[in-house]
Amino acid sequence: MASRSQNRRPAQEVDNTISYVQCDGLAAMKMVKHCHEESLSNMEVAQGALLGLVVDDRLEITNCFPFPKSSDETIDEEEYQLNMMRRLRLVNVDHFHVGWYQSADVGNFLSLPLLESQYHYQTSIEESVVVIYDTQKSKRGFLTLKAYRLTPQAIAMYKEGEFTPEALRNLKVGYENLFLEVPIVIKNSALCNIMMSELAEMVPEEEGTHFLDLGTASVLENHLRSMMDRVDELNQEANKFNKYQQTVIRQEQDKHRMLAKHAQENAARIAKGETAIPDDEITKLFRPPTVPPRLNPLIVSGQINTYAKHISQFCSQSLAKLYMTQALQGAKENKQ
């Protein structure tokens, strides 16, 4: 997972000091190339460092480089990053660390390692962002690059280090306000724009038949399977929390019963003129059970919400294609 090797400032509540992110076309192409190459291998996610600089309220990403594969234990990740930035500095390339990037599947990037990594980045470099590239959606023709930062509530949650229901309730933290999306724009030089205009004229025009492709069952099936897995995981977390609540209730009942019995015994002792026994021993017998952390259920809920949104959007697009196909088929039959 992404790591920071530079000196870290003390954790503090970080406001969003960046209005938007400006990414050079070369850096975007390098991220896309790396993520697609890793998606074809056995690597679950592709990760890398973002280099650039901050100008006023704009974060400029001018270059990037991939992190070494985690399966290679012979490479020191922090030393690798330092050597890369040192060599880039020698060739007059922006070498300031401004964040990191990661690939995602169908936009569902929310995970515990990502939260921890972005927390360390953002408390070390206040303006840092994480750029998420959706490989599956981009394969279908939609370039998806999004930049995110942790919200002040999420920073405060990690700073306190408590993920109990009461702590999350007091901080008003939910899966919908863990991250704040920062607008991202891709900038090319004037020569690149001229070349792209010339290439656009050289590319043959598509007939448009691929837009009516109805082979969408596999995509929808993968979405549903992933969401079912997340629902099962959330159900297991709910069962753990229910068992914890039942344990607390049962312990309180036993404690109340023993205290009542002890009060009767003390009343009898006082009636006999003896000294009452304190309740400290009984209180020590009933230690409160460990509260299960609620961060993982919070993340799983966010993943379910993401899958549900994608399924809803995908189904609406598929229905539109079906209606278009029905209209075209009817027009064809009328001509015949």
Swiss-Prot record:
Residues passing through the membrane, by range: none
A GO biological-process term: formation of cytoplasmic translation initiation complex
GO molecular function per UniProt: metallopeptidase activity; translation initiation factor activity
Nucleus as UniProt keyword: no
Entry keywords, A to Z: Cytoplasm, Initiation factor, Protein biosynthesis
A cellular component term, taken from the record's GO annotations: eukaryotic translation initiation factor 3 complex
Entries under PANTHER family matching the protein: EUKARYOTIC TRANSLATION INITIATION FACTOR 3 -RELATED
Family classification: Belongs to the eIF-3 subunit H family.
HAMAP family: eIF3h (MF_03007)
Protein name (record): Eukaryotic translation initiation factor 3 subunit H
